[in-house]
A protein has these predicted regions:
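Glycine-rich phosphate-binding loops of nucleotide-dependent enzymes
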Residues: 1-156
Length: 156
């Protein structure tokens, strides 16, 4: 497995764990890569992965801890459409049986993933609820779109 920066599989590493323990860890790492749809890239150095796939790898390393709560800070920022869709699907997939607290400004991503949306303005709670309700809230529209004439849609 070559997801460690620029090291290759045949590069010597010195570990304090036994070889058998390392094989167990390799097997778990491969499971995690498969879970985030990166198994086909296991032999590539992480530096060669696209930005979106690097973010998926970050999610895999978080999943290794089997968290009940995951914090994601703008997970799709700076991504192209294809990577955004891939990460959106991945977040939806890994959200089963865990809580995900996500800061995200891409309303398309938010609307397709979130059960509950909390909108803050200058640190104060502006609105909270399902996307359909929050996106029609006049205060939210005014704060983020500048007018209460239209519904909050699209990406920020």
């Amino acid at each position: 497995m070559r997801v460690a920066l620029q090291r290759t599989l045949d590069t010597s590493f010195h570990f304090w764990k036994s070889e058998r323990s390392l094989h167990t860890l390799d097997a778990r790492a491969m499971e995690l890569l498969a879970e985030v749809d990166l198994a086909a890239f296991a032999q590539l150095p992480a530096v060669e992965l696209s930005y979106g796939r690097k973010r998926a790898l970050e999610i895999a390393t978080t999943l290794a801890m089997e968290p009940q709560l995951m914090l994601l800070d703008e997970p799709t920022q700076g991504m192209g459409t294809e990577d955004v869709d891939r990460i959106r699907q991945l977040i939806k997939k890994v959200s089963a049986n865990r809580t995900i607290l996500m800061v995200e400004h891409n309303m398309s991503v938010v609307s397709s993933i979130a059960d509950t949306i909390t909108v803050l303005q200058r640190g104060a709670l502006l609105a909270e609820g399902p996307y359909a309700q929050v996106s029609r809230n006049p205060q939210v529209i005014e704060a983020y779109m500048g007018t209460a004439q239209t519904e909050l849609v699209g990406a920020h």
